[in-house]
């Protein structure tokens, strides 16, 4: 039976299509080696990556030969989309020529799940990123600090807390000037110099002991010992070179009583106050005693005795430090807590505010006691009452509000309150021959 023309044309078309498909498959099989490039990644010692240039498919095979030890450091390039990346046949051949040829593995492809393979690759990338970050951190951490001779005076000034030392010397000078008797300039200079050296020594030893804790606080993390600008040996040597001549000047240049007070204050600050800061809130009261001794030293340097006037000056400095320091520590509670210090503002905030207010009011009573002890005239408690009432008002606001704003106001008020109060005391100082006329202002 003869086939119809339609059947003959269908068979011819089917044969032509089949021949074309066979020809294309043969060309694809012959060109496959030119489209495959072996790319090695530092994923594992037992895996090799094969990347198909047409579809960017990654396959993993088991490494059989120990000679395949080539490692290429991965470059931090963002991965390109497989649907947007097109590689020409010429570039493929060039990449194939650059890479060495390796024998094909004899074992079949691994049949591990794709999730495990992706996890291996991701783990290698994360490990490499962590290693790079660790190297950069170590480079910053172990950066060499060079000490120049020109920078040494400034470093030693920060080591000795030069501003705090200046405050100590000024209160000592006020105690010397308020003491009865003639003003001896040579004794005054020796007292100021000896007290300043003793203060530098105490502050340097304090920083030496607190290096591990200061590094955790934003307020103290840039101190010289914390940053490694000077060695601990140099800091201790500087403290010794300040303490020995300072105590010698106070003992033999002034009088033994003043020298003994200087030694006691260094011991109290370095061996009692410094370790107590991490143990108990009583460190604040001990620190207030340390700050109250310098005006007493100035009084004993001028008179050679420890009488009621010296104790009154010490009491004024003692009470002034509580609103000053409690207001300061209130704004640094996070820092003190991070550094491991036991402060009233951290552990007993209500007591911190109550003590500050209590000693603000005590300044009024101590100012009233000054003319009773023949240190000043009766004009002093009158003219000092406004500033004492003002700091008491700020202390009350700090007690009621218990916020950072009120503590800052109280702290900045204390900065100008003390020098103004001492200046008023010097202005109203009791002169010889005025004991019977205490109500008149000095001429």
Swiss-Prot record:
Transmembrane segments: 174-194, 230-250, 252-272, 286-306, 308-328, 363-383, 410-430
Domain of life: Eukaryota
Region of interest (Disordered), residue spans: 68-113
Entry membrane topology: Multi-pass membrane protein
Pfam families per record: UbiA
S-adenosyl-L-methionine as UniProt keyword: no
Keywords from the named record: Heme biosynthesis, Lipid metabolism, Membrane, Mitochondrion, Transferase, Transit peptide, Transmembrane, Transmembrane helix
Catalytic activity entry: heme b + (2E,6E)-farnesyl diphosphate + H2O = Fe(II)-heme o + diphosphate
GO BP terms: aerobic respiration; copper ion homeostasis; cytochrome complex assembly; heme A biosynthetic process; heme O biosynthetic process; leukocyte differentiation; lipid metabolic process; mitochondrial fission
GO cellular component: cytochrome complex; cytosol; mitochondrial matrix; mitochondrial membrane; mitochondrion; nucleolus
EC number, UniProt record: 2.5.1.141
GO MF: geranylgeranyl diphosphate synthase activity; protoheme IX farnesyltransferase activity
CDD domains reported for this sequence: PT_UbiA_Cox10
Function statement: Converts protoheme IX and farnesyl diphosphate to heme O.
Alphabetized HAMAP family for the sequence: CyoE_CtaB
NCBIfam families the UniProt entry points to: cyoE_ctaB (TIGR01473)
Family: Belongs to the UbiA prenyltransferase family.
Protein name: Protoheme IX farnesyltransferase, mitochondrial
